[in-house]
Design a protein with these regions (language model features):
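Non-catalytic nucleic-acid-binding/docking modules located in mid-to-C-terminal regions
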Residues: 2-3, 53-57, 147, 160-294
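Noncatalytic, basic helical substrate-engagement surface that gates or grips nucleic-acid strands
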Residues: 2-134, 138-149, 153-158, 241-244, ...
Length: 294
């Protein structure tokens, strides 16, 4: 018996995308922008209309500066400007919209949305459900296993394990090592100086994982990689930095708050709550009707 897929949504990606793409003249009666919440609501409706999904989790970030990763490496994501107040309040509205649509929401002050998604993916996959991670964040592709998908909904790009190898040059289970070696500018993870995406991919294709690279470091100079001899020295010099980076790039799969209540079966739409919220946000009738139908 084939069990239905579970859809695990990385909320921040789609809230930020709406913030930048939906005109900021969407406001409520107090003149507060509602564009990000409006666009996020439209995204949720579109996703539910396309999939008729009944097992959905929406993961939010509450840990931009309080994540355990910040304790390990204080510069983690330090390159990001704080969200403006006009956007911050919309995150709560976005969560309220998702809850009114009957979707289970998750957030944790010490763990990122990635870790909550990773935990739920592991939990539901172990119970026979295929997993669909809904995000454009390449980090989350590391969670995909045979039968699963990473879905960049806005670009309609849905990738399985083979397609992830084609797109990123490494297998899903190698992505954390790949980012530790090559760095991830988006999250302010420096990687090893002089090791770019091509070198990181070539090393992992040959050795399989980062531990094997360092355990067999003397072999690196003999590889048909440009600058192999100097690459070997860079790896030796910056090994500790790479191992620290991997502690940042690996997505956790055992977050207690998510495992305490992992049920994600969709509830019925809270019509009264949705109407109150839409009245507050002054959303139009067309979006309201879509929400009531999905």
């Amino acid at each position: 018996m084939n069990l239905p897929p579970v859809y695990l949504i990385d909320a921040s990606v789609y809230i930020f995308r709406a913030w930048f793409s939906v005109p900021d003249d969407f406001t409520n009666a107090r003149g507060e922008p509602t564009n990000a919440a409006y666009g996020f609501c439209g995204f949720l409706c579109s996703m539910l209309e396309q999939t008729s999904a009944q097992h959905v989790a929406v993961a939010f970030d509450e840990s931009l500066t309080t994540s355990y990763r910040n304790e390990i490496y204080p510069e983690y994501k330090a390159n990001r400007d704080p969200a403006p107040e006009d956007l911050k309040r919309q995150f709560q509205w976005a969560r309220s919209i998702a809850e009114c649509l009957g979707l289970r929401c998750f957030a944790d002050p010490r763990f990122e949305a990635d870790d909550l998604i990773g935990t739920l993916a592991e939990h539901w996959r172990a119970r026979g459900h295929p997993v669909c991670v809904v995000s454009s964040d390449k980090d989350l592709a590391q969670l995909v296993r045979p039968g699963d998908h990473w879905w960049d909904f806005s670009r309609n790009e849905k990738l399985g394990t083979a397609q992830i190898v084609q797109k990123f040059g490494v297998a899903p289970e190698q992505i954390a090592d790949y980012l530790a070696l090559a760095g991830d500018a988006v999250d302010n993870i420096p990687g090893i100086p002089g090791v770019g995406p091509k070198s990181a991919s070539a090393l992992l294709q040959h050795f399989g994982d980062m531990d094997s690279i360092f355990n067999r470091l003397e072999e690196v100079q003999h590889l048909s990689i440009r600058g192999a001899k100097s690459l070997q020295q860079k790896l030796r010099t910056h090994r500790a930095a790479a191992e620290l980076a991997r502690r940042l790039t690996v997505i956790q799969t055992n977050v207690a708050s998510a495992l305490a209540k992992p049920e994600i079966h969709r509830n019925v739409v809270d019509t009264a709550g949705l109407n109150r919220l839409f009245d507050q946000l002054q959303f139009g009738g067309m979006l309201r009707q879509r929400c009531l139908r999905v």
